[in-house]
């Protein structure tokens, strides 16, 4: 047994095996995509930039139940609510600190009316920290911009909910 181990270490057996493995994959077709020019298809469950949705009549979906704020493990969501004259509650402030967010999707799962969702946008880099502090208006704009894709993804995913 010692002679076998000595022979393997003398002939650098592990390095040779590793080089053959490298050569094997070197000549296979590449699986990498060239990202900015080529974009892969996103899953309907992709968790990207947050958005607040509206009903088709334009009314905000959020009922200020604060379940998303309570369930957020990173404590990235801050909500302030006010009761309306008709008895319903609406948010006066809905902020998400995207620098704290871990994109777990628990806020989306907790929402009883599908108001807060993580949309399909994965390219939302910014130049300043302040731009990553999303307020209600920014979230509603995101929802309006991506509503057609978000609605389709939620419909596809509805069989699993």
From Swiss-Prot:
Cofactor note: Binds 2 [4Fe-4S] clusters per subunit.
Class in the EC hierarchy, top level: translocase
MF (Gene Ontology): 4 iron, 4 sulfur cluster binding; iron ion binding; NADH:ubiquinone reductase (non-electrogenic) activity; quinone binding
Keywords, comma-separated and alphabetical: 4Fe-4S, Cell inner membrane, Cell membrane, Iron, Iron-sulfur, Membrane, Metal-binding, NAD, Quinone, Repeat, Translocase, Ubiquinone
Primary location: membrane
Protein's membrane topology: Peripheral membrane protein
Pfam families: Fer4_7 (PF12838)
InterPro entries: 4Fe4S_Fe-S-bd, 4Fe4S_Fe_S_CS, NADH_quinone_OxRdtase_chainI
GO CC aspect terms: plasma membrane
Superkingdom of the source species: Bacteria
Cofactor: [4Fe-4S] cluster
Domain 4Fe-4S ferredoxin-type: 52-82, 92-121
Enzyme Commission (EC) number: 7.1.1.-
Keyword Cell inner membrane: yes
Its job: NDH-1 shuttles electrons from NADH, via FMN and iron-sulfur (Fe-S) centers, to quinones in the respiratory chain. The immediate electron acceptor for the enzyme in this species is believed to be ubiquinone. Couples the redox reaction to proton translocation (for every two electrons transferred, four hydrogen ions are translocated across the cytoplasmic membrane), and thus conserves the redox energy in a proton gradient.
UniProt-recorded name of the protein: NADH-quinone oxidoreductase subunit I
Native species: Orientia tsutsugamushi (strain Boryong)
């Amino acid at each position: 047994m010692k002679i076998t181990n000595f022979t393997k270490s003398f002939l650098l057996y592990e390095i040779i095996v590793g080089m053959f493995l490298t050569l094997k994959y070197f000549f296979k077709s590449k699986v990498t995509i060239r990202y900015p020019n080529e974009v892969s298809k996103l899953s309907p469950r992709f968790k990207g930039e947050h958005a607040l949705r509206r009903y088709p009549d334009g009314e905000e979906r959020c009922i200020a139940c604060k379940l998303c704020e309570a369930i957020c493990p990173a404590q990235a969501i801050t909500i302030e609510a006010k009761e309306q004259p008709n008895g319903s509650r609406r948010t006066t402030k809905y902020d998400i600190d995207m620098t704290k967010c871990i994109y777990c999707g628990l806020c989306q799962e907790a929402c009883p009316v599908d108001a807060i969702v993580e949309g399909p946008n994965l390219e939302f880099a910014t130049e300043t920290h302040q731009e990553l502090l999303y307020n209600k208006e920014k979230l509603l704009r995101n929802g309006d911009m991506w509503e057609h894709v978000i609605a389709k993804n939620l419909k596809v995913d509805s069989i699993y909910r």
